[in-house]
């Protein structure tokens, strides 16, 4: 090849393709992180961010979000409860600690530095910082998967997989949630790389304990990112115990490393809650007959808990139906990548290389165990669910799917050595898989440019109201009850208790706060109360929700005020809540009602705020 066709060791075609790849990548990063970014979209992602800020302040692994169930656990365990230093045992610790390091570096531990004081700004700056962390982790994961798949197959399949990853709309959406999925993707990809090296050594009848240990370390870090991934790890432990040398010992060695990494946190969970699984263990019931939020909001979940535990038939039925639903939604949960589900067809193909043939069974076993874990602990219909682990398998399943398609493509009679023969199937797969992103790109760009920066995740969040109004109206020793305590804790930097379902539980938690010389400032009600279509259910809204009148005040006032505008009348806030006999003790304490935003966010307080 002449020098005119080579630049720095690369031929012109390769150089141009790589330049285009990085240009597209830069454009996508700008689009998702700057142009179309509205804020963090996941409640649990927001909660992990505020835990990270507390860690950055030197407050250890504490949270300003108080769950009734966590309070119940601590009380049952006979622990001293301090609402100003409430230990979090719900979230896995690694992601908040990473957020803490980044927030400390940018000064995010100082609330006033990033407080939203300008009316025109609706995106919280620290939301973008958290999202940027996820983007960086995602890009690292793309690179690791390129190296892994190049080792398993070849650079063409690795390159196509990398392109499909960056063109997956779901991958980018996860970077906007605040959830640890991109961290998990990076760690899982690293673990797979060393698992494959261990497998190669095993096939060649030589021991590679170092690769197995490194894989176990990455899997342990994965577990510290999300406890549910322990199910995935168990899948690998089963395979290693039977097929990796030394047999049996390999599996116990992996479990030993996992215990070494997680032991400290298990002991702390036991110390704070009386359960090594902490409050996260109670999320088990999200996969059974009760929703997780119902359990988490109650400060006495024992009755519901025991009912569910002994209902074995319900357990089996719900677990089975959840697994079947996961299979039905697998395509979207794998990032809507056309060839990813073809991994299961690749299981039927007799690959010539033994390592490729055996590695797919490791992946399958880990996926099956992960699917079982998701079924037991609960997975909603949203493909951005915090428990969504399918996305971790998307790159490796995509690679096997591409290999399978390449084998079929090679059997088509096309000119040998031509571009169509070499890259035609890759182009088809990429164009179809990128469809969701391509279709939304123009519309989202126009919307972002026309909104002039007035974008946020509404409903249910409107950060300026919390960051400026609510924060300035309250003090550091104030406690706020809310149906979205994670938003109050993150955007307003105030201790927030998840609004319980019963008045008696509210009064109990209120007494806990006052006994600690804290002041309950009021109650914040937002559209979050209606997130689950509560009016469209078999049980009437309010049947098991004492605060239903409080939640309905906003929509009621909005509807009636519009009807009375022409008559010069306005409906006073708190119309329904003040008529409720159950809520009378509470409304007497918090009589002042302030419409914070568009009849959708109300603040019930002791003292009057200005009326918006």
Task: Show which residues each predicted segment covers.
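Membrane-embedded, lumen/periplasm-facing catalytic core of multi-pass transferases
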Residues: 414, 419-487, 521-524
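Hydrophobic/aromatic-rich transmembrane helices and adjacent perimembrane loops
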Residues: 175, 180-184, 189, 222, ...
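Hydrophobic, aromatic-rich transmembrane alpha-helices
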Residues: 140, 145, 241, 317-367, ...
């Amino acid at each position: 090849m002449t020098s005119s066709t080579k630049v720095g060791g690369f031929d012109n075609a390769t150089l141009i393709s790589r330049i285009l790849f990085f240009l597209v990548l830069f454009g996508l990063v700008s689009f998702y992180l700057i142009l179309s970014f509205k804020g963090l979209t996941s409640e649990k992602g927001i909660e992990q961010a505020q835990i990270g800020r507390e860690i950055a302040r030197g407050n250890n692994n504490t949270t300003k979000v108080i769950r009734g169930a966590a309070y119940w656990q601590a009380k049952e365990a006979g622990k001293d409860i301090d609402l100003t230093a409430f230990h979090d045992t719900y979230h896995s610790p690694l992601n908040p600690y990473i957020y803490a390091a980044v927030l400390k570096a940018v000064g995010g531990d100082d609330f006033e530095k990033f407080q939203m004081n300008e009316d025109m700004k609706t995106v919280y700056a620290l939301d973008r910082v958290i999202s940027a962390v996820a983007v960086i982790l995602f890009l690292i994961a793309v690179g690791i998967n390129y190296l892994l798949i190049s080792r398993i197959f070849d650079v063409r399949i690795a390159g196509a997989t990398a392109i499909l990853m960056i063109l997956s709309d779901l991958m980018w959406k996860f970077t906007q949630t605040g959830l640890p999925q991109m961290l998990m993707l990076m760690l899982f990809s690293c673990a797979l790389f060393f698992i494959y090296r261990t497998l190669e050594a095993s096939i060649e009848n030589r021991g590679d304990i170092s690769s197995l240990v490194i894989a176990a370390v990455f899997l342990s870090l994965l577990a510290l990112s999300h406890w549910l991934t322990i199910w995935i790890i168990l899948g690998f432990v089963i395979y290693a115990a039977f097929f990796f040398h030394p047999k049996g010992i390999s599996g116990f060695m992996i479990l030993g490393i996992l215990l070494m990494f997680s032991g400290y946190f298990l002991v702390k969970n036991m110390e704070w809650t009386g359960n090594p699984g902490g409050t996260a263990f109670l999320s088990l019931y999200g996969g059974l007959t009760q929703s997780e939020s119902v359990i988490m909001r109650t400060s006495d979940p024992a009755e519901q808990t025991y009912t569910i535990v002994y209902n074995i038939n319900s357990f089996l039925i719900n677990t089975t139906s959840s697994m079947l639903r996961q299979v039905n939604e697998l395509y979207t949960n794998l990032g809507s990548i056309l060839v990813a589900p073809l991994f299961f067809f690749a299981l039927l193909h007799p690959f010539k290389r033994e390592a490729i043939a055996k590695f797919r069974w490791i992946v399958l076993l880990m996926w099956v165990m992960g699917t079982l874990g998701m079924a037991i602990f609960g997975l909603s219909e949203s493909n951005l669910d915090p428990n969504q682990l399918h996305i971790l398998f998307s790159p490796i399943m995509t690679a096997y799917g591409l290999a399978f398609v390449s084998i079929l493509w090679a059997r088509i009679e096309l000119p040998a050595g031509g571009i169509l023969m070499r890259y035609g199937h890759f182009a088809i797969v990429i164009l179809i898989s990128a469809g969701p992103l391509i279709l939304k790109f123009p519309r989202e760009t126009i919307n972002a440019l026309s909104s002039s920066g007035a974008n946020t995740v509404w409903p249910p969040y409107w950060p300026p109201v919390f960051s400026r109004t609510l924060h300035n109206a309250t003090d550091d020793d104030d406690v706020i009850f809310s149906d979205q305590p994670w938003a109050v804790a993150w955007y307003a930097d105030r201790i927030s208790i998840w609004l319980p379902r019963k008045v008696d539980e509210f009064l109990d938690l209120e007494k806990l706060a006052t006994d600690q010389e804290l002041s309950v400032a009021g109650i914040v009600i937002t559209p979050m109360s209606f997130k689950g279509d509560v009016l469209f259910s078999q049980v009437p809204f309010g049947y098991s929700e004492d605060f239903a009148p409080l939640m309905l005040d906003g929509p009621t006032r909005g509807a009636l005020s519009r009807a009375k505008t022409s008559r010069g009348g306005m409906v006073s806030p708190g119309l329904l809540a003040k008529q409720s006999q159950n809520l009378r003790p509470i409304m007497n304490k918090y009589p002042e009602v302030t419409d914070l935003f568009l009849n959708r966010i109300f603040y019930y307080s002791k003292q009057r705020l200005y009326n918006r």
